[in-house]
Amino acid sequence: MAKGSSQGSRSPSQLIDGRIEELGDWRGQTLSRLRALVKEADPDVVEEWKWRGVPVWYDAGMICTGETYKSVVKVTFAKGAALKDPSGLFNSSLDGNTRRAIDFFEDEKIDEKAFKTLVRAAVTLNKSKA
């Protein structure tokens, strides 16, 4: 993000674009690809910018967040504990009753088909409870 730029005048999608550009490394590339997969899985998805800089995707409720850390890009599914995960993508936040997360590490290949299946399942769950 450019110094002095106002977050208030930028849309959530523009803020996410800025975060991806700001990262400028494998984390930005990974977040960008995961974002594209969410949009492919759910063309009606709405992007938000929450909690001082976390991309969040919604459709009839929160689907997932995209957090970036020094050594991991974490996608947390808000209702992940209620989702079937036959491909075993969930590898983080496994002990809770509600959320589940996937930690993506540098040079890790994304199972795109399985990821999009989880996104679609999360949307279906949200819509069933709406």
Where do the protein language model's features map onto the residues?
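Charge-dense, helix-prone N-terminal extensions
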Residues: M1-A130
